[in-house]
């Protein structure tokens, strides 16, 4: 029996227009690294979870190829079908 994944409803609180800039993009699963040296953290583009190199924060997840935008694993799994993401190994 295959597991069917449900796409989050249109009124899901995490939806904030991300389809304008994240639909169909290539993502890379990797350890968190700040986009700029003066930055110490980033947030999930959907739920706002904190990514950093500090204990207690998310230390890995999916990012755009340039490392600018980050998506936590939970939100990635919830939105991957709808957003048609391609994951680079």
Q: Residue locations for each model-derived region?
A:
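N-terminal alpha-helical interaction blocks
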Residues: 1-34
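Short cysteine-rich clusters marking metal-coordination/redox-active sites
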Residues: 44-48, 72-75
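Short, flexible, mixed-charge glycine/proline-rich loop motifs
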Residues: 25-43, 62-66
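Short Cys/His-rich "knuckle" micro-motifs
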Residues: 54-59, 82-84
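Short glycine-rich, low-complexity/disordered patches
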Residues: 42, 57, 88-89
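Short metal-binding segments enriched for Cys and/or His
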Residues: 67-89
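Intrinsically disordered, low-complexity regions enriched in Ser/Pro/Gly/Gln/His and often acidic
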Residues: 5-6, 32, 63-64, 76-78
């Amino acid at each position: 029996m295959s597991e069917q994944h449900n796409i989050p409803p249109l009124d899901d609180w995490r939806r904030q227009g991300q389809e304008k800039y994240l639909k169909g993009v290539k993502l890379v699963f990797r350890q968190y690294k700040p986009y700029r040296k003066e930055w110490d953290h980033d947030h999930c583009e959907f739920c706002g979870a904190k990514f950093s190199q500090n204990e207690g924060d998310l230390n890995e997840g999916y990012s755009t190829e340039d490392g600018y935008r980050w998506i936590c694993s939970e939100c990635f799994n919830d939105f991957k079908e709808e957003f048609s993401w391609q994951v680079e190994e």
